[in-house]
Regions:
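Conserved donor-binding/catalytic core segment of Leloir-type glycosyltransferases
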Residues: 4-5, 142, 176-189
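Carbohydrate-associated surface elements
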Residues: 147, 164
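Membrane-proximal helix-turn-helix segments that form the acceptor-binding/catalytic region
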Residues: 25, 29, 67-74, 90, ...
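A short, charged, and often flexible helix/loop element on the N-terminal side
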Residues: 49-73, 118-123
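A short, glycine/small-residue-rich beta-strand->loop->alpha-helix junction that serves as a flexible
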Residues: 6-22, 83
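Short, solvent-exposed amphipathic helices
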Residues: 84-90
Length: 189
């Protein structure tokens, strides 16, 4: 089976990234060796359910965190690089050039509109350019919904994998409460 590096663009532990965790457990159950590489407040290796989590410090200028993530990713001979979100997508240029291994990009956000709303037009424009240049160069894209999947399919091959909470995320009530009030359901990761 494959030896997979999952590269995160934000802290995996605080807050705990349930989406990445579910994906990693699924890959592990399928027989793959999986390790997570993530920004963190210090350099260390943690283990969670037999999965190594390589933490690299975020101290220093932002570019130094990217450098450390890439350095950690190329230090081992992984079979596949699984990049979460925008920054690791951009790192994939270097990973592909240095290691020539398959790159999977997991995009679960509408990045351009989000950047526009949170950081303005210039950030949205650079994000759009970065995606249009980098996404066609990865080996595959995974996303969470059909609309985003159709948008990204213009750039590369896409697989849509919906991200719903597991049944274990909800407590089981011993008895059912009867109520005339409506029930609301939340579907999300």
């Amino acid at each position: 089976m494959a030896n997979i590096a999952v590269i995160c663009d934000r802290e995996f532990f605080q807050p705990f990234d349930q989406r990445v965790y579910k994906e990693v457990l699924t890959l592990k159950r399928a027989g793959h060796e999986v390790e997570i590489i993530t920004p963190h407040n210090s350099n260390l290796i943690k283990e969670i359910e037999g999965i190594s989590v390589h933490c690299v410090t975020t101290k220093g200028p932002p570019v130094s965190t990217a450098y450390r993530l890439i350095k950690k990713a190329i230090a081992k001979d992984y079979d596949v690089y699984y990049c979460h979100e925008l920054d690791p997508l951009l790192y994939s240029f270097i990973l592909k050039w240095m290691k020539n291994k398959p790159i999977i990009w997991d995009c679960h956000e509408y990045l351009v509109p989000m950047k526009k709303e949170l950081q303005g037009n210039l950030s949205a424009m650079f994000t759009d350019i970065g995606i249009k240049i980098a996404a066609p160069r990865v080996d595959h894209i995974i996303t969470v919904d059909n609309l985003l999947g159709r948008q990204l399919a213009k750039l590369n091959k896409v697989t849509v994998v919906p991200n719903y909470p597991t049944v274990n995320d909800f407590p089981v009530l011993e008895k059912t409460l009867e109520s005339k009030k409506p029930n609301f359901l939340y579907v999300g990761g």
